């Protein structure tokens, strides 16, 4: 059994963009040109192949990262005529589904960043760009919708440079914009490409139009200067006025793209079939193969020693599970990226996070929601496994004889929660199982039971996120449920450092209970969560009781001292204590830890925190005053404003608690002509009057 395509001919790419930049349409065109589709689906008629969930077809947005495989042989460039395998992950553009983008980027070798030629760089573009920077993902930019009225290629380039702090280098410039968009000038070959008006998939190569000759020369010089800066040999040739070959330019462009020194920029109109073929050539030419990415580092699950895996079929098997999905026909699907080795269908793998062995029943190559069986997968492949029951997102799958734990994925905490109740007894029986399956698929979706009311609470990244999950309950799991009003996920923290003694003594005949701890409680910087330091010396507390102290503290943190909300960003140092030979126990020290923490937290200037959202509103100018006044009335802090795509935009930081129902209010305020995006920014201290209201609510709840 050998691989079909050499590793250097594989490209694992993501398509990332703001909502409505034309992402799903572009993927459809890629599949059409690479021979995977016979009829192209349009997003606006609900027929797109990659948008396969019912809600996606209805809303015209992509929610889950559908994965698909296709093949492409470039017509131009250094890989001309060589067949390449392209694995594509289509990622959602709505900020509530940022987790899908995050986990896709973790396993990709490159990305195509889509921008709308009219809208330019929009808020989600910035979010996704930051995520791609975090993982060092090489990318090319494709400026789509060049045929739309108001399209501005060069303005979008400027926005990429300024708003994304990147180095965009156009490899093409458009011939016409808006309704007169006809094609582009290829700055590497210095030729014009004119697309057929009726069928954009056919085109002819022409000389550069006279009125564009000077502009094309200027932008070619700009491109040559940019690539020369990253290669000394090329720089020398350029400064000496020597000829630089097309092959040399592409070779250096590739290296500079892989190093994320430059972002090659292309243009087109996917809807009109113009430009996608050349974007595919660029994917092959400039984006990384698994070999370019090189080795991945991890550690041994038992010894914690560093372990390295190279992208080779001969190395031991190592893969990362990056997505769990429920398929109506085959059950649980585990999407994984193979970093080294090979895996045959029917063989066993070790989950190095849980230490459990599981059998991979089938290995599938996915085409959106269709599938084909594979006998084996190899280094660099992206596939889906059937039969893995206990694997979760971010787990490492590996060879039992050579275990490794790859770097885990980190997901943001949910910021909004709602109570959910089944409508009937039948629904009640199914609700728990169905919610557990959804939580397994989505690491930012949490389910818990309120200890006091017994209500089931679901938490997620935004109103749309939870709305779609409740919708999936109804459609996929046939569970009808009522949902309550959204609740904000408040948090608590401390502002001061204090020492405190926690003591638990119980003497009631027979064996007593005794545990005494001395701890320091102090604030940590935002986002650090919780840190426990064992600074006990001289055996004043036996070693076996110290984990119990830590457990008691963590349990106490779940129920804060201000209004009962979870506490975060706190460091606790255990520095002293006492024990009793007979009466001490793990339970006694757990309770002592809890008492000590609660007492210390009350003295350490505790405060209530609320999630603050980064909000951007794009509105016609006549409504600007109303929009700004409304945001200020919601305790919003206006941070910036300006013009974008013929409209005004306002940036603000607003508490989440003030944003519920905002879409309806904005619609009525602007007659439906404005839109907005919102994403979590950080936690901030709640104003005193609101904190008091929340404390009163808590007190009245406790009194009931």
Curated annotation (Swiss-Prot):
GO terms for molecular function: GTP binding; GTPase activity; translation elongation factor activity. Residues 8-291 form the tr-type G domain. GO terms for biological process: ribosome disassembly. InterPro entries: EFG_II (IPR041095), EFG_III (IPR009022), EFG_III/V (IPR035647), EFG_IV (IPR047872), EFG_V (IPR035649), EFG_V-like (IPR000640), EFTu-like_2 (IPR004161), G_TR_CS (IPR031157). GO terms for cellular component: cytoplasm. It comes from the Bacteria. Keywords: Cytoplasm, Elongation factor, GTP-binding, Nucleotide-binding, Protein biosynthesis. It is found in: Cytoplasm. PROSITE patterns: G_TR_1, G_TR_2. Its main location: cytoplasm. GTP binds at residues 17-24, 90-94, 144-147. Catalyzes the GTP-dependent ribosomal translocation step during translation elongation. During this step, the ribosome changes from the pre-translocational (PRE) to the post-translocational (POST) state as the newly formed A-site-bound peptidyl-tRNA and P-site-bound deacylated tRNA move to the P and E sites, respectively. Catalyzes the coordinated movement of the two tRNA molecules, the mRNA and conformational changes in the ribosome. HAMAP family: EF_G_EF_2_B. Belongs to the TRAFAC class translation factor GTPase superfamily. Classic translation factor GTPase family. EF-G/EF-2 subfamily. This is Elongation factor G. It comes from Chlorobium phaeovibrioides (strain DSM 265 / 1930) (Prosthecochloris vibrioformis (strain DSM 265)). The gene is fusA.
């Amino acid at each position: 059994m050998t691989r079909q395509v050499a590793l250097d001919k594989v490209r694992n790419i993501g398509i990332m963009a703001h909502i409505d930049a034309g992402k799903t349409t572009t993927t459809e065109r890629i599949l059409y040109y690479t021979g995977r589709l016979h009829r192209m689906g349009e997003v606006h008629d609900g027929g797109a192949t990659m948008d396969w969930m019912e809600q996606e077809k209805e809303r015209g947005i992509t929610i889950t990262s559908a994965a698909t495989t296709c093949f492409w042989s470039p017509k131009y460039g250094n890989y001309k005529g060589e067949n390449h395998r392209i694995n594509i992950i289509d990622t959602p553009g709505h900020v509530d589904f940022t987790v899908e983008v995050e986990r896709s980027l973790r396993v990709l070798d490159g990305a195509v960043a889509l921008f709308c030629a009219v809208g330019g760089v929009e808020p989600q573009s910035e979010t996704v760009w930051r995520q791609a920077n975090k993982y060092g993902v090489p990318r090319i930019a494709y400026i789509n919708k060049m045929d739309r009225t108001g399209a501005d290629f060069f303005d979008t380039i400027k926005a990429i440079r300024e708003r994304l702090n990147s180095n965009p280098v156009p490899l093409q410039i458009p011939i016409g914009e808006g309704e007169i968009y006809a094609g582009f000038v290829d700055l590497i070959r210095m030729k014009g490409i004119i697309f057929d008006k009726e069928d954009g998939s056919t085109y002819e190569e022409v000389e550069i139009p006279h009125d564009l000759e000077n502009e094309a020369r200027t932008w070619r010089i700009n491109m040559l200067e940019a690539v020369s800066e990253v290669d000394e040999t090329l720089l020398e040739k350029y400064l000496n006025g020597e000829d630089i070959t097309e092959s040399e330019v592409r070779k250096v462009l590739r290296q500079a793209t892989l190093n994320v020194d430059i972002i090659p920029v292309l243009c087109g109109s996917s809807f009109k079939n113009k430009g996608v073929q050349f974007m595919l050539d660029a994917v092959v030419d400039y984006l990384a193969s698994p070999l370019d990415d090189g080795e991945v580092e991890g550690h041994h699950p038992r010894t914690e020693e560093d372990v390295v895996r190279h992208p080779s079929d001969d190395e031991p098997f190592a893969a990362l599970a990056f997505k769990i999905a429920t398929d109506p026909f085959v059950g649980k699907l585990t999407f994984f990226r193979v970093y080294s080795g090979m895996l045959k269908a029917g063989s066993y793998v070790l989950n190095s996070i849980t230490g459990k062995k599981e059998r991979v029943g089938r290995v599938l190559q996915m085409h959106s929601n269709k599938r084909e069986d594979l006998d084996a997968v190899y280094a660099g492949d992206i596939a889906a496994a059937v039969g893995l029951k206990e694997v979760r997102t971010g787990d490492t799958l590996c060879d039992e004889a050579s275990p490794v734990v790859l770097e885990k994925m980190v997901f943001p905490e949910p910021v909004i929660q709602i109570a959910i109740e089944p409508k009937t007894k039948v629904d009640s029986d199914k609700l728990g199982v169905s919610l557990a399956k959804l939580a397994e698929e989505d690491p930012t979706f949490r389910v818990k039971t309120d200890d006091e009311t017994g209500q089931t609470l679901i938490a997620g990244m935004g109103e749309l996120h939870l709305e779609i999950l409740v919708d999936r309950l109804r459609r996929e799991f046939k569970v009808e449920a009522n949902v309550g009003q959204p609740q904000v996920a408040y948090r608590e923290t401390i502002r001061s450092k204090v020492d405190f003694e926690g003591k638990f003594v119980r003497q009631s005949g027979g064996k007593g209970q005794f545990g005494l701890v001395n701890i320091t409680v102090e604030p940590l910087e935002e986002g650090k969560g919780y840190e426990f330091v064992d600074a006990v010396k001289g055996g004043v507390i036996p070693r076996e009781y110290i984990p119990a102290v830590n457990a008691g503290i963590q349990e106490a943190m779940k129920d804060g001292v201000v209004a009962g909300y979870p506490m975060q960003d706190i460091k606790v140092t255990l520095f002293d204590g006492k024990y009793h030979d007979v009466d001490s126990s793990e339970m006694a020290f757990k309770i002592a830890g809890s008492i000590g923490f609660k007492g210390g937290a009350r003295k350490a200037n505790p405060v209530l925190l609320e999630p603050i959202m980064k909000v951007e509103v794009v509105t016609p100018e006549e409504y600007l005053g109303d929009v700004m006044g409304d945001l200020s009335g919601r305790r919003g802090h206006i941070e910036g404003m300006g013009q974008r795509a013929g409209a005004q935009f306002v940036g603000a930081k607003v508490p989440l608690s003030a944003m519920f129902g905002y879409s309806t209010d904005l619609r009525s305020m602007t007659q439906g002509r404005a839109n907005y995006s919102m994403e979590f920014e950080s936690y901030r201290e709640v104003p005193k009057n609101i904190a008091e209201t929340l404390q009163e609510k808590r007190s009245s709840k406790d009194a009931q």
